Amino acid sequence: MTKKRHLFTSESVTEGHPDKICDQISDSILDAILSKDANARVACETTVTTGLVLVAGEITTSTYVDIPKIVRETIQGIGYTRAKYGFDAETCAVLTSIDEQSADIAMGVDQALEAREGQMTDAEIEAIGAGDQGLMFGFACNETQELMPLPISLAHKLARRLTEVRKNDTLSYLRPDGKTQVTVEYDENGKPVRVDTIVISTQHHPDVTWEEIDRDLKEHVIKAVVPAELIDGETKFFINPTGRFVIGGPQGDAGLTGRKIIVDTYGGYARHGGGAFSGKDATKVDRSAAYAARYVAKNIVAAGLAEKAEVQLAYAIGVAQPVSISVDTFGTGKVSEDVLVELVRNNFDLRPAGIIKMLDLRRPIYKQTAAYGHFGRTDVDLSWERTDKAAALKEQAGL
């Protein structure tokens, strides 16, 4: 059956989006704790609404951090600094409700099942079981230099640029909340050939006209980010299509940690196990194993073993070894998927403690991931984005 040309769409949001405010607060608290206590257990959830922030969750640590102070500093950094924006770092109420991690969970994480049964084979790796059951996916493809799908890559770049021109006063009438969406057309071979549609919605000062916003965003945001060769006379632009976006941020919509999991990953291009990232320390496989799966997939593609690769990992609570590892190359693999799974097992330690050690995840590195995506980042140095295993994989595959 002949493949047809098709469209695929992904979206991103700015750091001022209500859900992203929550992700950044949760990860700022996590970073503050990890900077003083690398072995802390953190599961920190945030919700925001008009004039109110609630931080709740389970945190077990030997240190103290000033949560309200961290909350206010994070909100200020995003740009909610005036009451007329509907949300103000100085005047919003901050409520906290923090418990310790459940002793039942801690028991399984502190000493993994294999250690309790004397089956741990690697003495170097401390016995840490998975903090929960679950399945995680990692993905990579050769559509972009950073080995990410083009739609989410462009959507993130537009969202980041929207924030940039607001903060550097190029477009001083912009306010923090905003969303971007990019539709890419793929040819019969599944290769991206053009941008079909761009949607940008941005919060703004009440006195600016739609015509001004439309002109400025095309000039200072879209042209600055999207390669000219991807845009043609048929490309459609929808800039603030409702005509007005003054009420935004937590005043416009309540926000919650972990509600932008597709924005955080691959824009819907790959499957998702359902677990969110922000506010969780690395013993939570929702986060660490998703990072590891991306690391594996990216190295497979970087090694030339496939044009695209999706890796699934799955865990049982309290058990260190993954219960399953699978690799799907969508027919683009240079070797069989069975061979790839064997290569993955031989080159990557995918036990929770192995992942933490391999990717050095006990550091305060998480706030920078809480907006504009956790993968394909070129602006920050993230260990799971390295391709340092590619040469070994290629050699062992005999290519």
From Swiss-Prot:
Comment on bound cofactor:
Binds 2 divalent ions per subunit.
Q: What cofactor is this protein dependent on?
A: Mg(2+); K(+)
What top-tier enzyme class does this entry carry? transferase
Cellular compartments annotated: Cytoplasm
Which keywords describe this protein according to UniProt? ATP-binding, Cytoplasm, Magnesium, Metal-binding, Nucleotide-binding, One-carbon metabolism, Potassium, Transferase
Q: Which GO terms describe its molecular function?
A: ATP binding; magnesium ion binding; methionine adenosyltransferase activity
Record: residues binding K(+):
45
User: Which pathway is it part of?
Assistant: Amino-acid biosynthesis; S-adenosyl-L-methionine biosynthesis; S-adenosyl-L-methionine from L-methionine: step 1/1
CDD domains reported for this sequence: S-AdoMet_synt
Where this protein primarily resides, as one coarse class? cytoplasm
**Which cysteines form disulfides?**
none
What are the transmembrane regions?
none
Protein residues bound to ATP: 17, 177-179, 244-245, 253, 259-260, 276, 280
What is the top-level taxon of the source organism?
Answer: Bacteria
The segments labelled Flexible loop in the record are 101-111
Q: Name one GO biological process term.
A: one-carbon metabolic process
Role this protein plays: Catalyzes the formation of S-adenosylmethionine (AdoMet) from methionine and ATP. The overall synthetic reaction is composed of two sequential steps, AdoMet formation and the subsequent tripolyphosphate hydrolysis which occurs prior to release of AdoMet from the enzyme.
Q: What protein family does this chain belong to?
A: Belongs to the AdoMet synthase family.
Per its UniProt record, what NCBIfam families does this chain match? metK (TIGR01034)
On assembly, the entry states: Homotetramer; dimer of dimers.
Protein name, please? S-adenosylmethionine synthase
